[in-house]
Structure formats: structure tokens, C-alpha cells
Amino acid sequence: MNTLKQYECTVIIDGGLQDDAIAAVMELVKKTVTDKGGVINNVLEVGRRKMAYLIRKTSIGYYAHIEFDAVPSVIAEIERVFRYEEAILRFLIIQLSSPLLEMRKRVEKYSVMLGSPEDQAEAEADADAKN
């Protein structure tokens, strides 16, 4: 069965690298996902952050979060490529299940309602339109 499933990947890149080296690693990450047949939905580059503990004697990491769709059989191949890239300190790929997706929708709905008055009015109008 070759149906696409939704995944999230969080990557921590060595924060001591130059900006162009970090950009090259991010391109490698994106290229790896797309070359293996994945479709990238969203990329959030959080930036450099101090890590809670040292990883390979490094205290600063560049955090990135990628959401993509892929066939489950290629996840092991993507992980293998990430594992061999020295600039990637840590990574985690999880499959988004239905409960996680539903919870995300609820969080987005209520976070908009807690925002500005304009956002709150828009969210209430959307809720009324659904009912």
C-alpha cells in the first residue's frame, strides 16, 4: 500500500556553523525528503537556540521543523541520510495520527480566539458559519 502519510520532522543542526553552511544543510534536508518522493507542506526555521545540554560538545543548535507527506517505506531511507550528515546533531520524525491532527486544529482554533479582537470576531464568524 503506497498511500502518503503525514509526518513531522524536527532537526537540530550544529549552531556553530556559518549561515551559508546551515542553509546548505537545510537544502540537503529538503532535497532528501523530496528526492525520496515526499511532498513538503511547511517549513518552520526557528533559528539558533541554546540547548538544554551539550550534544557533541555543542551548546547552540539551529532548530528547524518540517511537515511533509511521504510513503512510510521511505522514512528509514530519510533517517539514514540524516544519520550520516555530521552537521545534524539530532532529528526526530513522527507520523501524524488522526488524534494529533484533530488536536492541532482545536489548538489553532482556540489560539485564534484568544488573539486580537479582529481575530476573535473572525473565528466566531467561522464557528457560526459551520453551525
Swiss-Prot record:
Q: Name one GO cellular component term.
A: ribonucleoprotein complex
Would the keyword Ribonucleoprotein turn up in this protein's UniProt record? yes
Q: Which domain of life is it from?
A: Bacteria
Q: Which GO terms describe its molecular function?
A: small ribosomal subunit rRNA binding; structural constituent of ribosome
For this chain's UniProt record, which GO biological process terms are given? translation
CDD domains for the chain: bS6
Q: Where is the signal peptide?
A: none
Pfam families from the UniProt entry? Ribosomal_S6
From which residue to which does any coiled coil extend? Answer: none
* Swiss-Prot/TrEMBL keywords: Ribonucleoprotein, Ribosomal protein, RNA-binding, rRNA-binding
Q: InterPro entries in the record, alphabetically? A: Ribosomal_bS6, Ribosomal_bS6_sf, Ribosomal_S6_plastid/chlpt, Transl_elong_EF1B/ribsomal_bS6
Q: Does the keyword Signal apply?
A: no
Where are the bilayer-spanning segments? none
What is this protein for, i.e. what is its function?
Binds together with bS18 to 16S ribosomal RNA.
As for family, the record states: Belongs to the bacterial ribosomal protein bS6 family.
Which PANTHER family does the entry link to? MITOCHONDRIAL 28S RIBOSOMAL PROTEIN S6, SMALL RIBOSOMAL SUBUNIT PROTEIN BS6M
Listed name of the protein: Small ribosomal subunit protein bS6
Source species, please? Chlorobaculum tepidum (strain ATCC 49652 / DSM 12025 / NBRC 103806 / TLS)
